[in-house]
C-alpha cells in the first residue's frame, strides 16, 4: 500500500524546490529569510484551483494529473454542482448521477467520475480509495486478458468452421461495459465498507447489551448511548445507499442514461452515417456534362429518401431493443448489490430491535424496583399511622388533669396492651386491604 501511495502521489516539481530553497536562502531587508518553509508554487496552484486527480483507463493503467475545476467540467461535460459532490471537504449523502458523458459516484469514501474511457478520482491517501484503485486495476487487467482470450478462441473457431462463424458472428462477448465494471467495483467497495462497519458494531454491541441486562450501571448506560448514536448514523448512511440504488432501479430513464459506451458508439455511428450519407449524395450527384431527365430524377430521390427512412427506422428499433437489454443488464447488476445493502440494513435493524428489547427489559426491571419501593413506602406509611395512634394515646394520658385511672397500679399495663392490639389489628386490616386491592403481592 505504501508503494501505491508513492506511485499515486504527484512528484514535487523541481521549480517548486528551487523556489522554496531560494525563498529560504534569500535574505530580506530586515535580515530574516522571507516565506520560510512556504511552497510558493503550491500556493500558486491552489490559487489557480489545480487539484490532483487519479486517472484509470480501460486497460487498468493509472496516471496522476493536475487539472483545474473548469477543465474537468469541460472534459466530462458536468455542471459545477456535480463536482462539489466529489469535494472531500463537504459532506454529501450517497449519490449516483447519470449524465450525458459521465457517471458521478459519491458512495462513502469512493467519490469518482466514470466515463466511457476512464475513471477519475481525487488523489487521496485514504486506504479505501487506494484499495478501490488497486481493485479496479486488477479487474480491468483481468477482463482485458479475458477479452483477448475470447477473441483468440473466436478466431480459432472461425477458422475451423464457416458455418459456426455464420451462426454466431453477431454474438457479443458476455462482458460488462467499462462504466458498469467501474460502477460495480464502487458499489462493492461501498457495500463492503458498510457491512464491515455493521459487523464491528454487532461484535461490540451484543456483549455490552448482555452485560447491561445483568448489571445496570451509569458506565454501561453511557456506552450503550454512544453505541446507539453510532447505530443511528450508520443506519442512515446504509438507508441512503439502499434508497439510491432502489431509485435507480425504478427509473428506466436514469439507467439508460448511464450506458455511456452505447451512447458513445451511437454518436460515432451517427457521425459516420452522416458522413457516408454526404459522400453517397456527392457521388450520386449529377454531372454537368451529362443530360438530365426531368422525369426520372424525382422517383430516384423519393426512392433514396424511402430507403433512408427505412434504414433509420430499423436503426431506431435495434437501438430500442439494445437499450432494453442494456437496462435489464444494469438492473441485474444493481439488484445484486441492492440485496447486499438490504442485508446490511436488515442486520442493523435487527441490532436496533435488540437494543430496543434490552431497553424494554431494563424499563421493566426499573418499573419492578419502583413498584417495590412504592410498596415499601406504603407499608412504612401504614406503620407510621399505627405509631401515631400510640402517640395520640400517650398525648391523652399525658394531659395535666386528675383521672381515677392513674391511681390504679395495673392500669398503665392494660393501656399498652389494648393500644398495641388495636394498632396490630389496624395494621393487619390495612395490609389485607392492600392485598385485596392487589396493591401488594400476595
UniProtKB/Swiss-Prot annotation:
It is a multi-pass membrane protein. GO terms for molecular function: magnesium ion transmembrane transporter activity. One of its GO terms (cellular component) is membrane. The chain crosses the membrane at residues 378-398, 414-434. Residues 1-30 are annotated as: Disordered. InterPro entries: CorA_TM1_TM2 (IPR045863), MRS2-like (IPR039204). It is found in: Membrane. It holds the Pfam family MRS2-like. A motif (Required for magnesium transport activity) lies at residues 398-400. It comes from the Eukaryota. SUPFAM superfamilies: Magnesium transport protein CorA, transmembrane region. Keywords: Ion transport, Magnesium, Membrane, Transmembrane, Transmembrane helix, Transport. Expressed in the whole plant except stems. Has the ability to complement a mutant in yeast lacking magnesium transport capability. Belongs to the CorA metal ion transporter (MIT) (TC 1.A.35.5) family. Magnesium transporter that may mediate the influx of magnesium. This is Magnesium transporter MRS2-1. The lineage of its organism: Eukaryota, Viridiplantae, Streptophyta, Embryophyta, Tracheophyta. The gene is MRS2-1.
